[in-house]
Amino acid sequence: GLFEGEELSEPLGSTAGARDASGEFKSTVVVYPGHPERVLVIGLGDRKEFTTERARVAAAVAYKVAKGFKAEAIAWVLPPASEPGHYASALVEGTGFASFEFDHFKSGSDGKEAATELKSVEIVSRDDIGWAIELGETIANATNRARFLQSLPANVATPEYLAGRAGEIADAHEKVTVEVLDREGISAAGMGGLEAVSKGGQHVEPRLITLKYTGRGGGKVLGLVGKSVTFDTGGISIKPSGGTEEMKMDMSAA
């Protein structure tokens, strides 16, 4: 990355095409020093205005350029920062977010989340940022999983389907358990409102999904409640026709 008003360090600065790098936020220039094969210089804008969000955006822009070269690996030189871990995490997140594609219904798809051609992201830093890279990867993967689910139509992402995906999450993590209540269990628990809402859809069976993560233990209990209506038709008579297809995204709250 290059900040506005600054110049590339040598020997990269003497590489053909390097003078085209301006430092303007989101600007990109590719130079060919020989080793490595190519270097993408992305503008980071004013150094004083460089935030983790800008790092996230820069990483996303860089990924899209790298994708055009069918690159399998990206290496970042972490810009100097007071909190390098936060910026490292943001770079990984931005790369992961930009790699998301929804091709579930395209010919040849196996029905799972689309795999990216990118095999690795390396961040060069003198600081201990291993934890930050792991955090960024976790956030990106979880976000993209949610984006995949919200992109599915309501006839696929039914309450039963979401319960199955919750079960997959629990099976993949030792400290995560799942409990699912069906219509009978919901009714027995006195949750008449939830049961009533589900009657608005034909052949739709409600599910109450509870995922529990037991971490280190001994701390306070934190509960997050998400409404996941797989196709929200509430107030459909007063909603404009444009954007009706986005009602399926109401499930994102879960």
What are these regions, as identified by a protein language model?
Residues 1-220:
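Glycine-/small-residue-enriched capping loops at alpha/beta junctions
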Residues 166, 222, 233, 238-254:
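Alpha-helical metal-binding/catalytic segments enriched in His/Glu/Asp
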Residues 45, 184, 227-229, 234, ...:
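Anionic group-transfer/hydrolysis microenvironments
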Residues 209, 215, 222, 226-235:
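Conserved mid-sequence domains
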